From Swiss-Prot:
SUPFAM superfamilies: Adenine nucleotide alpha hydrolases-like. It catalyses: S-sulfanyl-L-cysteinyl-[protein] + uridine(34) in tRNA + AH2 + ATP = 2-thiouridine(34) in tRNA + L-cysteinyl-[protein] + A + AMP + diphosphate + H(+). Its EC number is 2.8.1.13. It comes from Thermobifida fusca (strain YX). The keyword Protein biosynthesis does not apply. This is tRNA-specific 2-thiouridylase MnmA. The gene is mnmA. Residues 145-147 are annotated as: Interaction with tRNA. The active site is at C103, C195. Keywords: ATP-binding, Cytoplasm, Disulfide bond, Nucleotide-binding, RNA-binding, Transferase, tRNA processing, tRNA-binding. It holds the Pfam family tRNA_Me_trans_C. GO terms for molecular function: ATP binding; tRNA binding; tRNA-uridine 2-sulfurtransferase activity. The keyword Phosphoprotein does not apply. It comes from the Bacteria. GO terms for cellular component: cytoplasm.
């Protein structure tokens, strides 16, 4: 029986080529564009933003060229609740979220997938650069465009209904294929930054949502060294925007303490951590390891990969890095790999140095 596939079409080149490949693979494909804003822009500003009226038109034109039915689904309410409001709440709590990861988890592979299955579709197809082999996520052959990090939150059940046709090619090859197919989006710029912040001003967006809330900036000793307009404007590892005149050395954000509305700063070496605790674990590539098990871990999108040991303990994931990492932010994902295969993911809740933790325990 021919599988019915719903192709999520953003209006970009990747999703258009993915839909075309799904048709060539013999699936019965229908295209859908997700309207994620109740008040969309008419056009993009260069590579900033997405989900514009222009994007929906590009998606429809691509579907016409491919020769598949096309619909637009209004997901603005779900997107605002599960992605935008979550983004604001996480920053207000002193954490640094990844909205692309949350969108994949809550919108594309929860709300959209559930609706697709209810309508009789068998799978959802997207243009993500990732491979799916034997039910496991693998990094794309294009290391620069690899998106396994932001998809690692998907469960085995969700992956069983997912199709990713672009994991075996580079972005340049995707564009060349789009041109050969006569798709007008072949040269369309990739979208960057956060899609619902079209001007790229995250700090300004958060201030409009949360308001100005001045508070102290303190150093490692607790001495006040400056004032901020809102702790939500900062993330761990940040240096710019602190406006600390007369500092003897560069200072970086070490932590954000929302209860006291305090931003703590210090030297770069104080950013080092080698112990991470993650919450909300998802194990798509293996069973939860009860014993210490070697993995590779990635701690931010397109970030460095570290060797580590990890285990699940009392519903949380504990990770010990072989070498310290700098600027690890709470709220980001810690994605565990075996080589290039995703094993599991969790949301970073705690970070520390092992010797620091041992000293605190001894006290």
């Amino acid at each position: 029986m021919t599988l019915r596939v719903l192709a999520a079409m953003s209006g970009g080149v990747d999703s258009a080529v993915a839909a075309a490949r799904a048709v060539e693979a013999g699936y019965d494909v229908t295209g859908v564009h997700l309207a994620l804003s109740s008040n969309p822009q008419s056009y993009r500003t260069g590579a900033r933003g997405c989900c514009t009226i222009e994007d929906s038109r590009d998606a429809r034109r691509a579907a016409d060229v491919i020769g598949i039915p096309f619909y637009i689904w209004d997901m603005a309410e779900e997107f605002d609740r599960d992605v935008v409001q979550d983004f604001v709440a996480e920053y207000a709590a002193g954490r640094t979220p990844n909205p692309c990861l949350r969108c994949n988890e809550k919108i594309k592979f929860q709300a959209v997938l559930e609706r697709a299955l209810a309508l009789g579709f068998d799978a959802v197809c997207t243009g993500h650069h990732v491979r799916l082999e034997n039910g496991r996520l693998r990094r794309s052959v294009d290391a620069v465009k690899d998106q396994s990090y932001v998809l690692a939150v998907l469960t085995r059940e969700q992956l069983a209904h997912a199709i990713f046709p672009l994991g075996d090619c580079t972005k340049e090859e995707v564009r060349a294929e789009a041109a050969r197919r006569g798709l007008t989006v072949a040269d369309k710029p990739d979208s960057h930054d956060i899609c619902f912040i079209a001007d790229g001003d995250t700090s300004g967006f958060l201030e409009r949502r949360l308001g100005s809330n001045p508070g102290p900036i303190v150093d490692e000793t607790g001495q006040v060294v400056g004032e901020h307009r809102g702790a939500h404007a900062f993330t761990v590892g940040q240096r710019r925007g602190l406006n600390l005149s007369g500092a003897p050395h560069r200072r970086y954000v070490l932590s954000i303490e929302p209860v006291s509305n305090t931003v703590r700063v210090g030297p770069r070496e104080a950013l080092q951590v080698d112990r991470i605790v993650g919450e909300r674990p998802v194990w798509s590539g293996c069973e939860p390891p009860e014993e210490w098990t070697p993995f590779l871990v990635q701690l931010r999108a397109h970030g460095e990969v570290y060797s580590c040991r990890a285990r699940q303990y009392e519903g949380r994931v504990e990770i010990l890095l072989d070498e310290p990492a700098l600027g690890v932010a709470k709220g980001q994902a810690a994605v565990l790999y075996d080589g290039d295969v995703v094993m599991g993911s969790s949301t970073i809740a705690e970070t520390s140095r092992v010797e620091q933790a041992a000293a605190n325990h001894a006290e």
